Structure formats: C-alpha cells, structure tokens
Amino acid sequence: MIAIYPGSFDPITLGHLDIIERGVVLFEKVIVTVMYNPNKRPLFPVEKRIEQITKCTQHLPGVEVDSYKGLTVDYAKLRKAQVLLRGLRVLSDFEKELQMAHTNKTLAEDVQTIFLATNKEYSFLSSSTVKEIAQFGGSVSHMVPENVLRDLREYYR
C-alpha cells in the first residue's frame, strides 16, 4: 500500500521525520510530498525542501520525495496511493485534519486518511515555531535534522 505524506515542510522537523519513520513500517512506500501552499510565504524554495527531506530520509527504505501543485487527492490518484498520512499533535490538529479528511473523501472516495499521533516529545513542535526561534538566534538543534539546522543557520546569519 502506498501512502502520501503531504505538507509544506518549511522546514522539515524531527516531528515530521518521526511520522515518516513510523509510516515506512506501516506502508510499503511513503511519498513525502512538498505541497505548494499559496497562503504561505515559504522560507526555503520547494527544491531546497525536497533536498532537505531527501537527505534526512535517505536511510529509510520505501521513502520517495516529490512535490505537487494542486489538490492532494488528485496527486494521490496520480500516484495510485490509497492513503493520506497525517500527524496529529494536539486536539486542534485533529479538528482541522478531520474536516480536511471529510472534504478529501468527497473528492476521492477511495483515498483514506490515516492519522498518527506524534510522540509526546514532538507535540509542541511546528515549522513555524522552529523558524521563529531560529530567526532570533535560539537553538533548534533538538527540533530539526542536522542538515536543516545548517541551512537555518546559513539563512539567518
């Protein structure tokens, strides 16, 4: 079974990586898909995010990294994926993600959404939090993979 793990991943965090690592145990392939979000102003271009994700997932068999501009369910159909993989940190994530899962179901009845609760050590973690802390010179070494940490230091120096 193929799962799509969509997101902006700007940047990828250890929380995202945790979901990917657990996803490869459950699915034969996990396609981490950098989605274009017109409502966000990205720190890193899509190509850089693909590079970051590829580097920190290279040790994981069954992971592919891609990007897509459009509806996630259309991409899932294009890639013949049966599952959208989503991580949940807190209750407010569940409310938003459940609404999106129901919407996606109306667009693609054969694509299921599977939720994985994040490990508690990552329940506070978001890309936005990482960027805010890094912007002001705080340490994010416990929040992002090493290659992303280097990119953030370079960006904010």
Swiss-Prot record:
Pfam families cross-referenced by the UniProt entry: CTP_transf_like
Transition state stabilizer (site feature) positions: H16
Record key words, sorted: ATP-binding, Coenzyme A biosynthesis, Cytoplasm, Magnesium, Nucleotide-binding, Nucleotidyltransferase, Transferase
Reactions it catalyzes: (R)-4'-phosphopantetheine + ATP + H(+) = 3'-dephospho-CoA + diphosphate
Disulfide cross-links: none
Pathway(s) of this molecule: Cofactor biosynthesis; coenzyme A biosynthesis; CoA from (R)-pantothenate: step 4/5
Cofactor(s) this protein cannot do without: Mg(2+)
One cellular-component annotation, GO: cytoplasm
Alphabetized GO MF terms: ATP binding; pantetheine-phosphate adenylyltransferase activity
EC number: 2.7.7.3
Enzyme class per UniProt: transferase
Top-level lineage group: Bacteria
Transferase as UniProt keyword: yes
Residues where ATP binds: S8, F9, H16, G87, L88, R89, E97, Y122, S123, F124, L125, S126, S127, S128
GO terms classed as biological process: coenzyme A biosynthetic process
Binding site for substrate: S8, K40, T72, R86
HAMAP family (UniProt xref): PPAT_bact
Summary of the function given for this chain in its UniProt record: Reversibly transfers an adenylyl group from ATP to 4'-phosphopantetheine, yielding dephospho-CoA (dPCoA) and pyrophosphate.
Subunit structure as annotated in this protein's UniProt entry: Homohexamer.
Similarity-based family: Belongs to the bacterial CoaD family.
Protein name: Phosphopantetheine adenylyltransferase
Species per Swiss-Prot/TrEMBL record: Crocosphaera subtropica (strain ATCC 51142 / BH68)
